UniProtKB/Swiss-Prot annotation:
Signal peptide: none annotated. It comes from the Archaea. NCBIfam families: PRK13695.1. Has nucleotide phosphatase activity towards ATP, GTP, CTP, TTP and UTP. May hydrolyze nucleoside diphosphates with lower efficiency. Its EC number is 3.6.1.15. This is Nucleoside-triphosphatase THEP1. It catalyses: a ribonucleoside 5'-triphosphate + H2O = a ribonucleoside 5'-diphosphate + phosphate + H(+). It comes from Pyrococcus abyssi (strain GE5 / Orsay). ATP binds at residues 7-14, 98-105. The lineage of its organism: Archaea, Methanobacteriati, Methanobacteriota, Thermococci, Thermococcales. Belongs to the THEP1 NTPase family.
Length: 179
């Protein structure tokens, strides 16, 4: 089962992915993949980092500065991203009960290795929760269950995705810890 979540910037896509990861992990399942977080310098966003969900390893995805490749005002650090994201996704394919990819977006698409790894994830039978940049929605909507996240529906979407993931992993919503 694949779940794709999109929405406007700042609506809570990454927060939803982290909440799902934390809840599933608390229930005894192995969660793998990546989360992308903003880097802020004071009140201004100055870049993005990628974090491996299984190890906590951090790499730089993008920063404000000079260089290429670019997405808007950001320079994409393909090497920094690949150093963390590709092994994390590979480990998730091998070891995790569920794969989380936050985000499938224009910055990540600058990495050919990411595109290959994403292709393997999409071919696998492992449950997937992925956040998708709003400009790429049409490409991924047909591949699984799709949600457009808003401030009004984010708690409902969280509960629904969590319930469905529990079903896929052999749980019901009232299940206790896996032991």
């Amino acid at each position: 089962m694949r779940f794709f979540v999109s929405g406007m910037p700042g609506v809570g896509k990454t927060t939803l992915a982290k909440r799902i990861a934390d809840e599933i992990r608390r229930e005894g399942y192995k969660v793998g993949g990546i989360i992308t977080q903003e880097i802020r310098t004071g009140p201004k966003r100055s870049g993005f980092r990628v974090i491996a969900l299984d190890t906590g390893e951090i790499g730089r995805l993008a920063y404000v500065g000079q260089g290429y490749p670019r997405v808007g005002r950001y320079v994409v650090d393909i090497e920094g991203f690949d150093r963390v994201a590709i092994p994390a996704i590979s480990r998730a394919l091998r070891d995790a009960d569920i794969i989380i990819i936050d985000e499938i977006g224009p910055m990540e698409f600058k990495s050919n290795e990411f595109l290959k790894a994403l292709g393997l994830v999409l071919k696998s039978e492992k449950p997937l929760l992925a956040t998708v940049h709003r400009k790429l929605v049409d490409r991924y909507r047909p591949l699984g269950r799709y949600y457009w996240l808003t401030p009004e529906n984010r708690n409902e979407v969280f509960a629904e995705i969590l319930m469905e993931i529990r079903k896929v992993l052999g749980r019901n919503e009232n299940a206790g810890n896996k032991a």
